[in-house]
Amino acid sequence: MFGVAVASSSPTVAARCAFANAGIGAVATQNITDPSKGPRVLNLLKSQADALEAIETLQDSSDFIEYRQILVVDREGGTAIHSGKHTLGTWGEAATKNAAAAGNLLADKSVPRTMINAFEETENSDLHLTDRLMIAMRAGNDAGSEEGPIHSAGIKIVDDMPWPIVDLRVDWTDDCPIDALDALWARYKPQRDDYVTRALDPTSAPSYGLPGDT
């Protein structure tokens, strides 16, 4: 299972920045982002490159790579991060096996390390990966987050299916987007497995419980 969680002062951040493929890995493209780098890295991972090799390939062959901040987790839990010299404002990065965190325009460069610490603290729990990433993202927010207010957030999770089993976004709010995303997850979580069942075997799927659904 792989996932990406992201929050930003910019609108619709997850639409541009979160990429993951089941059995392959996860990628976040940040800063002055180029969304094409997400699928490209996933293709490199699919071709048996590890996280570091994928980052090194981008560094050697991509235009404007110094404007990008790219995080990779590969199928073995290996991690790599590229933060170019034009990464905006105060920036930071941190990684451990199975997880990487980075940010720009931060209130404090220690924010990513705080996120990794929070993620590691839930390692032996029964929490779903979505919950673990939400906890890490909230820890980063509590540690200062961006220097200015954040307005959008999203989370994407892949597992055994060729589509994301969780793909939730708050594209803009004047309130805390992490709170809004957490509320959306709380609503979706009890139904998550039912939507997979409806895709694989509609005859055994539960009713939607909506007017007109018989």
Annotated model-derived regions:
Residues 1-214:
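N-terminal nucleophile
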